[in-house]
Amino acid sequence: NKYFKKNNPVYDFWLDGLTIDVKYSSLYKRKNGNSHHWQLRTKGNQDFIVAFLERESGSELEEPNILLIPMQFIEEQKELHISQSGRWINDFQVEPEELQPLLKDYALLRKNGLF
C-alpha cells in the first residue's frame, strides 16, 4: 500500500503546474423525493477539483453540471454535500467551453507566482 500511494498521486491530471482531481457524482434523491443533492470526496492535496455532476437521475455524463472548485475554498472536509441551489453550484459552476480557458488562466497565474 505504501508503494501504491507513492506511485499513484492523489490527483488525476497535471496542467502546467496545476494538479487537478476529476470527480463524478450521481444525483441523489431523498426518499420523500423533495430534495436532490450530490456528494464528493475532497481528500487530497490537489489544487482544483473538477466535478461532473449528473444533471438528471440516470443521465450520467449527458450534459452534466460542471464545477471548478479551487481547494482553498474547501475547509478540511472529506465529503462535500452539494445541493441544487446551494453555494457550490452558484459560485463554482462553469460551462463546458469555459473549463479549459479557466484552467489555463489559473496555470498562468501560478507560473507568474500569483496563485
Task: Set out the residue ranges of the language-model regions.
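Nucleic-acid endonuclease domains
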Residues: N1-F115
